[in-house]
Amino acid sequence: MSKQQKKEVEQRRCFGIISHPDAGKTTLTEKFLLFGGAIQLAGAVKARKAARHATSDWMSIERDRGISVTTSVMTFSYRDFFINLLDTPGHQDFSEDTYRVLTAVDSALMVIDSAKGVEAQTEKLMEVCRMRNTPIITFINKMDRDGMAPLDLLSDIEEKLQIECAPLTWPIGAGKGFAGVYNLYKKELQLFTAGGKTRQKDGIVIQDLDDPKLAELIGESKAEELREDIELLEGAANPFEMEHYLSGSQTPVFFGSAINNFGITELLDALVEMAPAPGLRPAESRDVSPLEEDFSGFTFKIQANMDPAHRDRIAFVRICSGKFNRGMKVMHHRIGKEMIISNATMFMAQDRANVEEAWPGDIIGVHNHGTIKIGDTFTIKEPLKFTGIPNFAPEHFRRVMLKDPMKAKQLNKGLTQLAEEGAVQVFRPLTSADNILGAVGVLQFDVTMARLKAEYNVDCIYEAIDYNTARWVECPDNKMLDEFRKANQANLALDGEGQLAYLAPSQWRLGFVQENWPDVVFHKTREYN
């Protein structure tokens, strides 16, 4: 390990933003880029009727619907730190893609709408974070709108998510009377005006809450309310404990309004000062340190057609150790072949730049013509396999039928590419030539339909089919597995990677089959090979 490598790793931050739909996540992403100098002007974010679209929502279906359905990777600098930000899908039907993103980050930022508190999707994503003990910072957004009282919001988070809250900033007023935030750990007050579309300048700083100037700036009633709140918090709130945050048991909480630039600086400061630098990554044989000399990384996402004009596919690779150099030769372990990575890119949403070098914690894009899949590991020599990137059993199914039988080749190509991205799962029954799509949420079918038509010129009919869930099956006894296949072939299919799966018409039927075949193992998730 060189001094440069140690310094580069310490300066890296890789985090994902998670939230319920419409909590303001994409707006916050844009403001981070704005404050980091990556973009000059924030878009008219999420104005659903506006012609413009948010910088990070670049796929046409996202612009049309005003939701994020794929993961955007964005890179920017703030202070002396190099930040890799993963803007995850907020829509509940895309939790599978979000989960895969959470395997690539070192920490997460949870965005909560002050008017709604903790919502269902946030709870689901929190479960995923807890599986990995991911450190989480919380941003309570939209304080410039009428919402729940700050103390009620903290209680809501603690009760529903079973995580201790440690507020680090505190709002002054709310709704139309929102005047700024008080920084509890720096003991200073920052007042803001709505920033509109440009970066907000630093606010006025007041070190002492008893300063008469405070009342002049925000009014006596707000000043008195703030003093009372801070006195109450100093006695009742949980003090921030770095160790508890890093273990995932405590979340520091910040208040603000992303669209008006309230509280963004404090949040960015916390992300570089508190959030962890890249750490150990689990592989099948051992844990891998970012300070190791040899390069290693894994693919957590495939995105087809980022530029429809070029029909390209990009593999998103998280670097786990060593240093990446342009043109370096690596071993692609799943297929056992060496490859030269000469055209890696980094991202600012749809914009890309060629990479000469990259370090642990960075996300690079590798051009891919179908040989790279989710979960693939690249190293200089050691045959590592990083773990914890699963497929989830789908809960919704559709049969795909072509309107024009002459387009079968385009359909197969489109389905193969979309399945490798993880946008949808494809099952091919043992007893028919059907294509059956499986998804965690029904919106994935709409996205698949739109993308097949727009990117592959394929028009299909999507027919509901009587399946309720799927399980991947395996049995160490080949003779018994053959008997199982013969007895249940009407419900068996191969997934996109050729793995055998049982498609169940109901939970009762699944339980019945499991009971009758106790030596066959039924898996609810499957690691990417």
Swiss-Prot record:
Family the entry assigns: Belongs to the TRAFAC class translation factor GTPase superfamily. Classic translation factor GTPase family. PrfC subfamily.
Residue span(s) of domain tr-type G: 10-279
Pfam families recorded: EF-G_D2, GTP_EFTU, RF3_C
Key words, A-Z: Cytoplasm, GTP-binding, Nucleotide-binding, Protein biosynthesis
NCBIfam families: prfC (TIGR00503), PRK00741.1 (NF001964), small_GTP (TIGR00231)
UniProt-recorded name of the protein: Peptide chain release factor 3
Any GO CC annotation of this UniProt entry: cytosol
Name of the gene encoding the protein in the UniProt record: prfC
PANTHER family in alphabetical order: PEPTIDE CHAIN RELEASE FACTOR RF3
Binding-site positions, GTP: 19-26, 87-91, 141-144
GO molecular function per UniProt: GTP binding; GTPase activity; translation release factor activity, codon nonspecific; translation release factor activity, codon specific
Superkingdom, natural source: Bacteria
GO biological process, any: regulation of translational termination
Function: Increases the formation of ribosomal termination complexes and stimulates activities of RF-1 and RF-2. It binds guanine nucleotides and has strong preference for UGA stop codons. It may interact directly with the ribosome. The stimulation of RF-1 and RF-2 is significantly reduced by GTP and GDP, but not by GMP.
Gene3D superfamilies: P-loop containing nucleotide triphosphate hydrolases (3.40.50.300), Peptide chain release factor 3, domain III (3.30.70.3280)
Subcellular location as annotated: Cytoplasm
